[in-house]
């Protein structure tokens, strides 16, 4: 695969979809930097066992100074930054059988602010401080976790997920704007979610189960490997004509989604 020997930064790589992606990119021969506030020993060990180089960098992406230092550390260690995957986020488990987040009338301002600071501002910080290195190379790929629209108001699973969806739709708009700014520097910036690609069986299962999903919830969810597959590896090789778009992968090919 074209990501072999590429330097790939995965924020939020200690767990969830980020951890799955770390293993997939390691298997494809990439050089990994895992940026997370959570302990990274487990994923670093998994990546090393796959024969890949890995650099864990403890970082709170809400803190711009920490992010700036993290990008400097990765560049100093590897000499370049080829791919940034902005995976780190506070995720609502509204489809995992966990307690719902509060609806707006019951939500503390501090809760709302923390989700926006992590999901949206964290993506901004990481993108901002990776771009100068990519501009220097005149090449790079940035993959943001965003979505092009909000959930159907009739979907009961969307209740309590308001601020999460606000953050992800905002990331979609952010992607379009930054992609336009960086096109002349040959930096491809796309937005995509873990699902929305290959058709899934209509068996009543909702959400995506990862290594950290409680066993009692896994039967009602789809396993991350069956849903995500290699879509982020494909996105890390996306052509410039897709930059700025919401994309997914179907039948092993990247597809532009309608806004």
Q: Residue locations for each model-derived region?
A:
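The beta1-alpha1 cofactor-binding region of Rossmann-like NAD(H)/NADP(H)-dependent oxidoreductases
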Residues: 58-71, 109
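Canonical Rossmann dinucleotide-binding motif of NAD(H)/NADP(H)-dependent dehydrogenases/reductases
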Residues: 3-33
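Substrate-binding pocket helix/loop in short-chain dehydrogenase/reductase
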Residues: 95-104, 108-113
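A short, exposed helix-loop element centered on a Lys and neighboring polar residues
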Residues: 127-128, 176
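Catalytic loop of short-chain dehydrogenase/reductase
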Residues: 109, 141-170, 175-176, 180-184, ...
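Active-site loop of short-chain dehydrogenase/reductase
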Residues: 6, 53, 80-81, 134-148, ...
């Amino acid at each position: 695969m074209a990501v072999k020997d590429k330097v790939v930064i995965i924020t939020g790589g200690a767990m969830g979809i980020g951890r799955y992606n770390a293993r997939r990119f390691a298997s494809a021969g990439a050089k990994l930097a895992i940026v997370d506030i959570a302990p990274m020993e487990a994923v670093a060990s998994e990546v090393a066992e796959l024969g890949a180089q890995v650099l864990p960098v403890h970082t709170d992406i809400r803190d711009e100074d920490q992010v700036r230092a993290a990008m400097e550390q990765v560049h100093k260690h590897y000499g370049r930054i080829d791919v940034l995957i902005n995976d780190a986020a506070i995720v609502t488990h509204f489809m995992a059988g966990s307690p719902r987040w509060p609806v707006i009338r019951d939500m503390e301002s501090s809760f709302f602010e923390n989700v926006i600071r992590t999901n949206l501002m964290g993506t901004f910080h990481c993108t901002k401080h990776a771009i100068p290195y990519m501009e220097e190379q005149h090449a790079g790929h940035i993959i943001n976790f965003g979505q092009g629209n909000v959930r159907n108001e009739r979907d009961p699973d969307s209740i309590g997920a308001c601020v999460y969806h606000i953050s992800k739709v905002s990331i979609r708009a952010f992607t379009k704007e930054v992609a336009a700014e960086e096109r002349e520097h040959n930096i491809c910036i796309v937005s995509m979610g873990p699902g929305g690609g290959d058709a899934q069986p209509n068996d009543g299962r909702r959400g995506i189960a990862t290594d950290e999903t409680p066993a009692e919830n896994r039967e009602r969810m789809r396993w991350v490997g069956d849903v995500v597959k290699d879509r982020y590896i494909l996105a890390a090789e996306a052509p410039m004509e897709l930059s700025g778009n919401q994309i997914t992968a179907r039948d092993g090919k990247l597809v532009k989604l309608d806004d």
